[in-house]
């Protein structure tokens, strides 16, 4: 059960990073101190930035 809880937390961190990227926040806005969660947040943020670069999101 422990692994699932950790995975869910990391998936949530990635989703929040993605949302932050979609609205154009800087990567320094990452709220996570834990390296695992921070890495997932930044991964989501990078995915969103790539989407913005390819015109996936319009303001």
Curated annotation (Swiss-Prot):
Domain of life: Bacteria
UniProt keyword annotations, A-Z: Cytoplasm, Translation regulation
One cellular component term from this protein's GO annotations in UniProt: cytoplasm
Subcellular location: Cytoplasm
Primary location: cytoplasm
GO biological process, one term: regulation of translation
One Pfam family linked to the record: RMF
Function: During stationary phase, converts 70S ribosomes to an inactive dimeric form (100S ribosomes).
Stated family: Belongs to the ribosome modulation factor family.
Protein name per the record: Ribosome modulation factor
